[in-house]
UniProtKB/Swiss-Prot annotation:
This is Signal recognition particle receptor FtsY. Keywords: Cell inner membrane, Cell membrane, Cytoplasm, GTP-binding, Hydrolase, Membrane, Nucleotide-binding, Receptor. It catalyses: GTP + H2O = GDP + phosphate + H(+). GTP binds at residues 308-315, 391-395, 455-458. Residues 1-71, 116-135 are annotated as: Disordered. It comes from Synechocystis sp. (strain ATCC 27184 / PCC 6803 / Kazusa). Part of the signal recognition particle protein translocation system, which is composed of SRP and FtsY. Pfam families: SRP54 (PF00448), SRP54_N (PF02881). One of its GO terms (biological process) is protein targeting. The keyword Cell membrane applies.
């Protein structure tokens, strides 16, 4: 099982902890050109298997590697992905559908928490089915719920169509770029999965709007030697348009200017140096932390609070995180504590069904969010799960109310689960740019934030806001979203982000 939370990043890293797949008996017709290139005796099935399971001998470890090495690495990775696909034959569609439906029904039944104290706790009898809830209440609420349900259905249909699988994968330009990024991080071709290739493809495409406006203009400027005043002003304008922010822009220009005074760099080398600057900005908030890794602790309960303004994608992020946690081998529960926004609880339940994760909710109106969190902790403890995800209200009308609510939730957690590892993540809409950053400053004051989840990168030309978050708020980017699908949220890698931003 591939653990997305503990996936290792960074240039020249060793292979990840997850063990490489066992050697597969690969049919020559899967990738004949690779077999002929890498085996001296193609007729020997065992020798083919051994060579495919082991890393190719010429795996590149840096951007200076020979392009032919990357090509061989990509071919080997492609062949291994296809070999694993051949090993695991998919069940018939009807059986798969039955399994999924059964899982969803079982999940719906699990939205039950037995009361453990005087706190009000939701029981199965109290929780009407989604159909019942949508048909009760005022007409305006019914209409709102129906719209939310239709919206979620539309997103789900779009999700399936946009996901790349081993069957639909081709060795196209996206695959070659993704393979090069993975190889440059020291990854083994035997360890690469179709899911990783698919994610890097989406990240590259998601940052294309920012990249088109950024790279070509920068190359034409930085390749002309030391920066004069006109060049500085032009670079400043380019970076600010990408919402890099004033502080980060000043730092980038100063550092780049100092370097170009020392030596004249051709455009490609200047861009490589610019990549180093950007990575240093993104990684700086991690320097003061004990570990750069952000993953649920294997032992004990982890409580992750998700905060952010309405419309930033907070509830959607909850569902995607739950799905990723389950895929990575963690047991997870969601607490629907956003009781302020209409239909928020219903939206969380839809995402819970999709991800196959139980949702703890209170069907009453104007429920105390802290009571829902209490019930969520009780459910997590009784089921011995690793991770509790808490959806909180996205309010900025009154900072005092926000601070009071978050403080009350933290008190409940400290009392009910004193040994839990508590993290607070801010969900930020990348399309808002600097406006979103100002909202983030309010949440940073109200909550002890552990990091930021940057969403909607696929619809924005303002991907530079990630640099502004790191520079101005000194907050690490923990996860990024580049699509509407349930698999389109992944842990953040400064190396992969910068490569997609400047070298895509």
């Amino acid at each position: 099982m591939f653990n997305w939370f503990r996936r290792q990043f960074g240039k020249d890293n060793t292979a990840p902890e997850s063990a490489p797949p066992e050697g597969a008996e690969v049919s020559p017709e899967l990738a004949p050109e690779v077999i002929q290139a890498e085996t001296e005796s193609p007729s020997e099935e065992d020798s083919q298997t051994t060579e495919l399971a082991a890393p190719p001998p010429e795996e590149p470890s840096s951007d200076t590697a020979n392009p032919d090495d990357y090509l061989q690495w990509a071919k080997a990775a492609y062949q291994n992905i296809q070999a694993r696909k051949a090993e695991t034959v998919s069940p018939p569609e009807s059986a798969a559908a039955i399994t999924v439906e059964a899982g969803i029904e079982e999940t719906a039944e699990e939205i039950v928490v037995a009361p453990e104290s005087d706190q009000a706790t939701a029981t199965e009898a109290d929780l009407p089915s989604p159909e019942t809830e949508i048909t009760t209440g005022p007409a305006w609420l019914q209409k709102s719920d129906r719209l939310e349900a239709l919206k979620e259905t539309a997103v789900e249909e779009a999700t399936v169509a946009g996901t790349l699988t081993a069957e639909s994968m081709a060795m196209d330009d996206d695959f070659m770029w993704s393979a090069k990024v993975l190889a440059a991080q020291g990854r083994s071709a035997a360890d690469v999965s179709a899911e990783e290739i698919d994610w890097l493809r989406k990240l590259r495409q998601g940052l294309s709007k920012t990249r088109v406006n950024l790279v070509n203009q920068l190359k034409s400027i930085v390749g002309q030697g030391p920066l004069n005043e006109a060049a500085v002003e032009e670079i400043e304008a380019i970076l600010l348009q990408a919402d890099v922010g004033v502080e980060a822009t000043d730092y980038i220009i100063t550092t780049l200017q100092d370097k170009l005074r020392e030596e004249a760099l051709p455009p490609e080398q200047a861009i490589e140096f610019l990549k180093e600057i950007l990575r240093s900005i993104l990684d700086r908030p991690l320097l003061s932390l004990p570990s750069a890794e952000f993953a649920p602790e294997a032992e004990g309960l982890n409580v992750w609070l998700l905060t952010g303004v309405n419309g930033a994608g907070k509830t959607t992020t909850i569902g995607k995180l739950a799905f990723m946690a389950k895929q990575s081998g963690y047991d997870c529960v969601i607490a629907a504590a956003d009781t302020f926004r209409a239909a928020a609880v219903e939206q969380v339940k839809v995402w819970g069904e999709r991800s196959g994760v139980p949702v703890i909710a209170n069907p009453g109106q104007n429920t105390d969010p802290a009571a829902v969190v209490y019930d969520g902790i009780s459910a997590a403890q009784s089921r011995n799960v690793n991770l509790l995800l808490v959806d909180t209200a996205g309010r900025l009308q009154n900072k005092k109310n926000l601070m009071d609510e978050l403080a009350k939730i933290r008190r409940i957690i400290d009392k009910k689960a004193p040994n839990a590892t508590v993290e607070s993540l801010l969900v930020l809409d990348a399309t808002l740019g600097q406006n979103g950053l100002r909202q983030a400053e309010v949440f940073a004051e109200a909550a002890k934030l552990s990091g930021v989840v940057l969403t909607k990168l696929d619809g924005s030309a303002k991907g530079g806001v990630a640099l502004a978050v790191a520079q101005q708020l000194n907050l690490p980017i923990r996860f990024i979203g580049a699509g509407e699908g349930i698999e389109d949220l992944r842990p953040f890698s400064s190396y992969e982000f910068v490569e997609a931003l400047l070298n895509g």
